[in-house]
Amino acid sequence: MNRFLRMTAVVLAAAFAFLLAGCGGSSASTSFTWFVDNIPANLDPQVATKAEDVIACENLYGGLVRRNASGELVPDLCERWEISSDGLTYTFYLKSGLTYTGTKGAATDYAITAEDFVYAFRRVFDPQTASPYAVEFSAIQNSTAVLDGTADPGTLGVSAIGELTLVFRLSERDDTFLSKLILPGAMPCDEAFFESTRGTYGLFLYMSA
């Protein structure tokens, strides 16, 4: 394996530890080394589409829900969720005390809050993002108008009630909506961190020796 692949494996291993710590796991150091055939070129979950990028994002970030070993949808970063009787409102109650953790377990000041999910979905429907996940979540209220620039992003049917309560409002029923929340595009994005890194998301310059 060449040096480039080895370096990528190390980056993925360190970032995987970021996910485990962010999900409120044990304080003990945990690492996972995954050797890949193709180098991930994009670690931005709102735009990742290539198989290697999606696999990396699915292992780097946590979402509201995940599938367990039996294939059932279970809470991940949330404690629980509620669905209205008409199927148009989804309310998620996030776990408290979740934080993003840097490589090698370095602590950060970035807490995972409902606003991170709001910002993530606003990015999905920002025309400049050109997110492939916009079509998957087109049932969200005002998503089409926000995407085509005729409505303010603040009118998108994704809102935070306090730090730990996230609400989705749909314009039409979508019985697959919950399962779509395991997609990378639905994973949280801290606005301050994103702006500070200009969306580079761990990508690095490589110079061969």
Predicted features along the sequence, with ranges:
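Bacterial signal peptide processing site
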Residues: 24-26
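N-terminal lobe/hinge region of extracytoplasmic solute-binding protein
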Residues: 35-85, 205-209
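Aromatic- and charge-enriched surface segment that lines or borders ligand/interaction sites
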Residues: 79-136, 167
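Bacterial N-terminal signal peptides that target proteins for export
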Residues: 1-9
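C-terminal motif of bacterial Sec signal peptides marking the signal peptidase cleavage site
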Residues: 19-22
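Sec-exported extracytoplasmic/periplasmic mature domains
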Residues: 65, 69, 96-99, 122-130, ...
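Gly/Pro-rich hinge or "lid" segments in bacterial periplasmic/extracellular proteins
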Residues: 163-164, 169-209
